[in-house]
C-alpha cells in the first residue's frame, strides 16, 4: 500500500501538471479573497463574524502569528479554534474569525471525553483536513502535498504555543461525526490544546 502511494504521488512534470499548478495557485487566492470577504455586510454587522479585538491577547497573538504564514499553507485545512465557549474558524490573513458554532461547550466536552483530557478551559485548535482542494488540481501529488501542509500547520501552531499539547491518537470516526464531517473529504487527524 505504501509503495503504491509513493509511486502514484510522485510529481510528474507533464503538460497537464504545468497547466494545473498556476490554476491551483489562482484558486487559493480566489478562495481567500471571495470566501468570507472583508467588505461583506455580514462581516461589517458582525452577524457571523467576530473581530479579533474581542478575544484574549493570547488568541490574538496566535492569529497574528498564523497570519504571517503563506495563505497557500491553509488551502487544504479549515482551522477551527475553541475559545471563549465558542468554535471559530480561522480565516487566513484576516482580522476576524467566522463563528462556526456559538455554543461549543457541548462539542468540546465530547472532544475532552475522546481524548481523556479536560479541554474546557483551554484554547483548542481543531484542524480539519480537506485534501480535495489540492487533489482537484494536482491529483495524487496534491494529496501528498496536502498531508505535508497539514503537518506544517500543526508544527507552526506547536511552535507558537510552547506549552501546547498535540493529540493524534483518538477515535477519528467519532470525532468526525461530532463535527459533522464525512471522514473522507473532510476529517480531523489531530487536535492541539493550550
Model regions: which residues?
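N-terminal accessory segments that position/regulate proteins before the catalytic core
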Residues: 1-194
Amino acid at each position: 500500500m505504501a509503495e503504491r502511494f509513493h509511486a502514484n504521488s510522485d510529481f510528474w512534470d507533464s503538460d497537464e501538471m504545468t497547466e494545473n499548478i498556476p490554476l491551483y495557485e489562482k484558486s487559493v487566492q480566489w478562495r481567500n479573497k471571495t470566501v468570507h470577504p472583508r467588505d461583506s455586510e455580514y462581516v461589517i454587522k458582525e452577524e457571523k463574524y467576530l473581530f479579533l479585538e474581542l478575544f484574549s491577547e493570547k488568541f490574538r497573538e496566535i492569529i497574528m502569528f498564523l497570519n504571517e504564514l503563506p495563505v497557500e499553507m491553509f488551502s487544504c485545512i479549515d482551522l477551527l479554534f475553541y475559545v471563549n465557549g465558542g468554535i471559530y474558524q480561522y480565516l487566513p490573513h484576516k482580522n476576524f474569525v467566522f463563528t462556526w458554532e456559538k455554543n461549543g461547550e457541548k462539542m468540546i466536552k465530547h472532544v475532552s471525553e475522546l481524548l481523556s483530557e479536560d479541554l474546557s478551559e483551554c484554547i483548542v485548535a481543531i484542524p480539519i483536513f480537506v485534501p480535495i482542494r489540492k487533489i482537484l488540481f494536482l491529483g495524487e501529488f496534491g494529496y501528498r502535498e496536502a498531508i505535508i501542509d497539514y503537518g506544517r500547520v500543526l508544527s507552526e501552531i506547536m511552535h507558537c504555543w510552547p506549552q501546547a499539547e498535540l493529540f493524534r491518537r483518538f477515535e477519528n470516526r467519532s470525532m468526525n461525526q461530532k463535527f459533522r464531517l464525512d471522514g473522507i473529504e473532510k476529517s480531523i487527524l489531530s487536535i492541539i490544546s493550550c
